[in-house]
Amino acid sequence: MGGNHSHKPPVFDENEEVNFDHFQILRAIGKGSFGKVCIVQKRDTKKMYAMKYMNKQKCVERDEVRNVFRELQIMQGLEHPFLVNLWYSFQDEEDMFMVVDLLLGGDLRYHLQQNVHFTEGTVKLYICELALALEYLQRYHIIHRDIKPDNILLDEHGHVHITDFNIATVLKGSEKASSMAGTKPYMAPEVFQVYVDGGPGYSYPVDWWSLGVTAYELLRGWRPYEIHSATPIDEILNMFKVERVHYSSTWCEGMVSLLKKLLTKDPESRLSSLRDIQSMTYLADMNWDAVFEKALMPGFVPNKGRLNCDPTFELEEMILESKPLHKKKKRLAKHRSRDSTKDSCPLNGHLQQCLETVRKEFIIFNREKLRRQQGHNGQLSDLDGRIGSQTSSKLQDGRNNNILTHTCPRGCSS
């Protein structure tokens, strides 16, 4: 009785901004550097996505707002087969939300921990796919600065996708980046050098060094240098000076040559463009159009019968999370009712001011709507202009000069 109506997808006004109610929460699957991630289904289209959500108050208290805004500003101008693409961004009183491509194959770190053996053929294809993504980012003046197995997700067929742009930076013209950012074991020598003596700065080659470290680790199970998060910088720089990278005698000559050129300490001599990669004899037989079209099948395909992530994330969300997502609707209704009776506990003035600024400055994005407006051609026709005028002007070496600085003088987002 009435069953027919229950199966009809809800109809949302095309002009209405996408919000939390437009999605059904299915399960928690992970934690990023600035938030948690769950699988969601859009109620009207039934399409599945990953939804990252970040608590506003925690972001303000931890000085993370700028990084969240940076990631949003960069991702709204990008779309590529080997990136995790942004579809929607919106907010409510508690959280900021980013809805992105759902990739259920897990990240490469997870598979390394599961002792997956990656063949040379598989890693060769990964390098090619990631090279296409890095070339695309470089075209729009973006350095990712955190390429590593943790930030490379697999789709169900085993193709790679770069995620996590919260420490990425946009360069203007021929300028170089000058702040130390990244994950130590994957950071290029010139990034550490900038920290020690100012140096000349660094540019796009740092991402290609990180690609080399990642490829080496996938093949061997450990990294070319014994660097950890606690390793002192002077010790790291000394390692680069005196230690030689050891390449397995079982690897083919072409792979060793490719890795050596990616792990060249001098950024001027390092492989750091798609043209450089394509010039390698080892990759002469590669059909690059087929790579771009995902027509070449990777040697490793994730297990479709299991969720390729740590199952404890779901337990944490259900049991340990003080503000679980599945109870949000009821919780917000209760807060709104309490606010209307003036019976709520006010936050301290400075925090309240920061949260209000976050609300005003938050970037709302809807790729589905954008595509409709552009005639369903699937192309972001104004991509170059939007990246150039909006993102580059605001993001200079990771410093977003326009976000929160005018109303939060005590640095809640620095």
Curated annotation (Swiss-Prot):
Domain of life: Eukaryota
Polar residues composition bias: residue spans: 388-400
Boundaries of every Protein kinase domain copy: 23-283
EC number(s) given by UniProt: 2.7.11.1
A matching Pfam family: Pkinase
Binding, ATP: 29-37, 52
Gene Ontology MF annotations: ATP binding; metal ion binding; protein serine kinase activity; protein serine/threonine kinase activity
Ranges for region Disordered: 374-400
Active site location: 146 (proton acceptor)
InterPro entries in the record: Kinase-like_dom_sf (IPR011009), Prot_kinase_dom (IPR000719), Protein_kinase_ATP_BS (IPR017441), Ser/Thr_kinase_AS (IPR008271)
Family: Belongs to the protein kinase superfamily. Ser/Thr protein kinase family.
Name of protein: Serine/threonine-protein kinase 32B
Species of origin: Mus musculus (Mouse)
